């Protein structure tokens, strides 16, 4: 997977946070492959650890777009 587009799915903050957490967990198994992840549109913005997880993904070279 190189692109994950979940924009405009009306996800609550808890769901956005969970997606980001799951993606952080998957980093070690991806062998350095980067992913473009889109979670904006009608989705809630990440909160708390979701913000931290987004930063972790960006630091790993991913492109992550959220509200």
Where are these regions (language model features)?
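Solvent-exposed loop and capping/linker segments of extracellular ligand-binding repeat ectodomains
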Residues: 1-67
């Amino acid at each position: 997977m190189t692109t994950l587009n979940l924009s405009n799915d009306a996800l609550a903050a808890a769901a956005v946070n969970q997606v980001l957490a799951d993606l952080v967990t998957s980093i070690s198994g991806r062998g350095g492959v980067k992913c473009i992840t889109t979670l904006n549109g009608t989705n809630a913005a990440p909160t708390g650890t979701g913000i931290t997880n987004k930063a972790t993904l960006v630091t790993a070279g991913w492109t992550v777009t959220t509200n």
